[in-house]
Amino acid sequence: MFKLAAGFLVFLALWVPTALAKDRLASATLVLFNSNDAESAELARYYASKRSIPAAQVIGFDLPVAEQITREVFNRQIADPLRNQLIEKGWWLVRLLPDGTTRVFDTRIRFLALMRGFPLKISSDPSIELPPPMEGIPPEVSGRNDASVDSELAAMGLPDFVPGGLIPNPYFGRFTPILEESVSPGLLLPSRLDAPTAAMVRKMIDDSIATEKEGLWGWAYVDGRDISSGAYIEGDNWMRKLVEILRQSGIPTIFDNLPETFQENFPITDAAVYFGWYAGDINGPFLREDFRFRPGAVAVHLHSFSASSLRNSANHWCGPLIAKGAAATLGNVYEPYLPFTPNLDVFQDRLLAGVTLAEAGWMSQRAISWMGVVIGDPLYRPYQAWNQFSDPRSRQENPFRRFRSITRSSRSNILLAMLPIHEATMETGNSMFLEALGNAQMDADHLPPALDSFREALKIAKDPEVQARLELEIAFVSRRISPEEFQEVSPEETFAEESDTQEKEVDPSLQKPKEETPLDWLLNLPYPDL
């Protein structure tokens, strides 16, 4: 009897904090849909029921069905009605200032779930008189009033909100969950449940909720460009930092630091995390008919127009990534300029800390009232299970969990874990352990040990896709060790090199963006640096 009582108390200790957190998140969420789109209304009800969001917090708006709207439509049919409801229902507490304006000083709402059918972006309107630009901000930024609907909603409760240029994001780089923050009561965190089809949106919702129970497990793939100087180095710095964060967290990671994106013949398996740049449309292995991300996956490709439309499975990146099974991504609806795209290392770091997708997404944005969108369930916490105690006897066998445990027990450095990695490989017969070690060794320029790890992994690999990838990795490391022996190796047998692509006709969408406008000023703007 005592054991039963003790077990029940342990269950309560684990369950109650999680349940309370879910209730708080649901109570702080509004679900917004397009009343003129039947699927939008149905998806709103579906999501609210899955997340236990009160029916009174599901709100329809009389809107066009197009993804792009005008500034006038945004103000009259979205911003003004939403602001009125927030105040009338007591979700925002406002104070009248001497100049006749109002200021939000307390809030009950922090999250907005925008359902498929809700407009995505606001077109530029040259007739709008713009306010004077902030000091140091050039006209390329301050002279624009196009924006994502989501980013405008994030900013509309702030005292310095104006329909032109960008606003420094008061939540950028923060660590604290928004419900524990005193920062800017008028700040809202929108996230968009949107995809090429309504069925894909339901899958995003279901996969997110299911993944939270055990956590997001699988491989991480990071695709850099080998940039070491110039205006675009910041993007590659994010990729390199991402690799460090992922490996220290115990996630097996493959880092492609060649100028091209992943080649089409590169096998990607068990993909839970993907970050890459810089191509206009989805390409490489993601085009394969049979490719799918793991349920709940987080996948982001950095590109200026990655979220220009979410209704197409073949163009841009955000829509196609969701169509391939990802549950969460980030994007831009118009040109944002590199410093005002999401800081991807901040994004992944905050997700790993256990905050929601919406929180991590907006923590990673230097600016709001700009071009960014967060796509996925705003309340999705892919790693919340990692940060909770659970009875190991109830866990399913999971080699990725064991890999994380080994890494964390080795001072978060997989290079110090060779013995336990080999022990896990012998006990499980799983090649993942040695392949992940080999990739870390390769990136640290420990080439002979990396070659040994890949060769040993190949001996036990059972999946043909994994075998093919290991053969590519072996060839790549061998070429680095003895380049003179591999001069005649065709690019199909190893990773493609820059010299190979220079002899072929290059797809314009894969080329670096033209640097017609000097970007030096972007590096000196008054926004916090990492």
Task: Write out the residue ranges for each language-model feature.
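Long, low-complexity, intrinsically disordered segments
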Residues: 506-530
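Alpha-helical solenoid scaffolds that mediate protein-protein interactions
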Residues: 423-425, 457, 464, 493-496
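Cysteine-dependent hydrolase recognition
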Residues: 22-432, 439, 443-448
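Sec/Tat signal peptide C-region and signal peptidase I cleavage site
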Residues: 17-21
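Alpha-helical linker/edge segments of TPR/alpha-solenoid repeat scaffolds
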Residues: 476-491
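Bacterial N-terminal signal peptides
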Residues: 5-15
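Boundary/linker segments of alpha-helical solenoid repeat arrays
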Residues: 432, 462-470, 497-503
